[in-house]
Amino acid sequence: MRIVDLSHRLTEGMAHHPMHPRAPVVLTGSLAHDSTARWMGEHPDFGRVSFVNEQIVLSGHTGTHVDAPLHAGRDRPDAADIDLAACVGAATLLDVSEHCGPRVVICAADLKAALPDGEALAPIVLLYTAWSAIHDTDPERYYRNSMGLTEDAALYLRAAGVRCVGIDAPSIDAPHTPGAPAHMHFLRRDPPVYVIENLRGLDELPLRVPFFSAAALPIASSSGSPVRAYAVLDADPGQHTQKETP
């Protein structure tokens, strides 16, 4: 068994989508090691005992995250009401990295071409665009010139019965796409197709992913939630060839 971490590390001051609140801010909590060590006493095996905690301020759309239907429509379900069963289970990886480029949109034909004949889509579909290669090296370009789906691609995935779509880009819609069609078709219709954005490491996955998880925190009134996305593989599947920096 091999576990593949598909989430970006959350750090104070990290780059973020220009339309979302600033990156995480870590504030001093109510406990600090120096102060608690003065009154917690000692343990015979571990010496001086101390504890620390902190307060973290962050957006529901920080780093690798899942969009709740509320993100795209008034009076829609929030992050606390995301169906966990839709975001956990077997997944299909569609490698569309040959189209990788600034503001490129992936259409239904591209998705169909990435699916071998005779293969059916799993309820969870992961889109490997290779755009995440510049997440750390050129974050401004990563966020402002990202890739996304066309409307017909979103309709194709919904018609196939997909319940969750993940992408290694900051948004399921490219920044120049009017009307945000992928968000609308996925999040404003029932049942919703949950959207996981800012994935990484998809180049390490095979076509058939035995187990994928991206569980949201049950945050009431939030339009999204950071997730610790990961895949569990039965064995080392080998790797896709990593694309050059877009």
Protein language model features and the residues they cover:
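Active-/binding-site microenvironments in catalytic and ligand-binding cores
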Residues: 1-246
